[in-house]
UniProtKB/Swiss-Prot annotation:
Fe cation binds at residues 177, 219, 223. Binds 1 Fe(2+) ion. Its cofactor is Fe(2+). This is Peptide deformylase 1B, chloroplastic. GO terms for biological process: translation. The gene is PDF1B. Keywords: Chloroplast, Hydrolase, Iron, Metal-binding, Plastid, Protein biosynthesis, Transit peptide. It catalyses: N-terminal N-formyl-L-methionyl-[peptide] + H2O = N-terminal L-methionyl-[peptide] + formate.
Amino acid sequence: MAMAAASWASSSSFTRFLRPLLSRNSSPSPISYSLHRYKSANCLFFSASSNKPPKLAVYAQARRVLSSKTKGDEIATPADLSFVVPLKIVEYPDPILRAKNKRIDNFDANLKKLVDEMFDIMYKTDGIGLSAPQVGMNVQLMVFNAAGERGEGEEIVLVNPRVSRYSRRIIPYEEGCLSFPMIHGDVKRPESVKVDAQDINGTRFEISLSALPARVFQHEFDHLQGVLFFDKMTDEVLDTIREKLVALEKKYEDRTGLPTPESINTRKIKKAAVGFGKS
C-alpha cells in the first residue's frame, strides 16, 4: 500500500492525468476507479485500471458504527435544503463558501434529488468532487467520483462527515477547485483518513480512505468547514495564484455591486502584521 501511494505521488504520467486534482482534465491514458464490496471481508476496495499497469490501489474498510450527533451542530431546516434546478457553482469570494454548514437530519426524496443534481453539475463542469456550499447550500453534504465520468467508477455520497483519524504522512499535490476556475496550486494533506459519516438513507458508517479518494474527501470536507484550498497553501504557492484570486474578487464586485467580502491582499497584510508574513 505504501508503495502504491508512493507511485501515485511520484509518477509523472499519473501526475499529468490527475492535474488539476478536483477539475478533471482529459488524458491519452485514462484511469478509472471502481468501488467493489466484498461481503466476506465487509470492505470496500478502490482499484485503478487503465491501458497500462495500475499505479494505484486504495483500500477502504467500512463498517457500521453507532455515533451520537456532534454537540452544537445546528440542524438544517426544509428551507435550508430547498434548491432551484439547475444548480450553479458558487465562486470565490462568495460568503456562502465561508458560512457555517448545518447538519442534515432529514433523509428524504428531496435530499436524494439534491444529490442527483450535485452529481449532474459536477460532471458537467468536469469535476470529480463537490460540496453542498459550492452550489449555494450551507449543509453538510458532499459527493465525489474519482473517475470523473458518469457511468464509470463509483459515486460516493457522504452526509454529516467527521474525521476520526488522519495519517501522519503528509503528501503535497497540485489541486484545483470548481469554485476557483483555472486556478491550481500545491496543497499538503495527510495521505489517508478515517471518516465517520451517514449515507443517503441516514445509515451511519465508518470508512478509511487513502491516496486520491482521501485527498478528494479532504478537499470537500474543508469546504464543509468553511476552509478553502488556498488557505492551506504556503506563501510561495499563494503568490503564484494571487493575481487570479484578485481577478475573482473583482469579478464578484462587478457582478454583485458589493465590495468583496474578503481580499487575498488584505489577508497577506494581516499575516505579516502578526509575524507570519514574508520578511
